[in-house]
Amino acid sequence: MRFHPPLEEGRLIRRYKRFLADIETVGGELLTIHCPNTGSMLNCQVEGGQVWFSRSNDPKRKLPGTWEVGETPQGRLFCVNTGRANALVEEALQAGVINELNGFTGLKREVAYGQEKSRIDFRLDYPTGPAYVEVKSVTLGFDGTAVAAFPDAVTERGAKHLRELAHLARDGIRAVQLYCVNLTGVEAVRPAEEIDFAYAAALREAVACGVEVLAYGVRLSHEEMVIDRRLDVLLNG
């Protein structure tokens, strides 16, 4: 997935109210842009850090741009825009990059399902039956380690999705939790038990019920991003 039009560069002044970020472009222009990330962005955002953003010329938009990519204090790149994860995964599915999910004959997005009135990111249809795939974007990393973690803030919604997947697996339906790691320099993923114990417990319970857990890494630059490798999943940290 290439960024089109090309991203522009700037530096972060501050992020606030979750969805807003003040930046200064390389040309000295001060802008308030959209921050499309509901998480804490722990260990990612730093005042004065480099940012890359897409600019919109749509007069109906309230904000002139969207924060897409940033650089952590450790020099890693991360994708701010969590909405990119589903598009990346779909691109990888269609290209056959995610080997464990190859062979599907149909793909549907945002399908209603479950006991708690949820929507699954992807339902893949196979001759043997469907597979339900939930996608999460991961950006939380730590100094001196190549292990990323999820979530970066307490997420009841994320735990709910795991419960829904567990219900499917108990009924003999294939259910998959897929972590799309939008952070460079990562080799494995673990649940962030120190941030959300309930989510970590729900993940382990889901696995015990038969839910498959996959993690894939993204090759990321300010020009393009593409899923290119499988990562290890460390359920016990």
Curated annotation (Swiss-Prot):
UniProt xrefs under InterPro entries: SfsA, SfsA_C, SfsA_N
Cystines in this chain: none
Single GO molecular function: DNA binding
Pfam families referenced in this protein's UniProt entry, alphabetically: SfsA, SfsA_N
CDD domains: SfsA-like_bacterial
Family under the similarity heading: Belongs to the SfsA family.
PANTHER family according to UniProt: SUGAR FERMENTATION STIMULATION PROTEIN A
Protein name as catalogued: Sugar fermentation stimulation protein homolog
Organism: Pseudomonas fluorescens (strain Pf0-1)
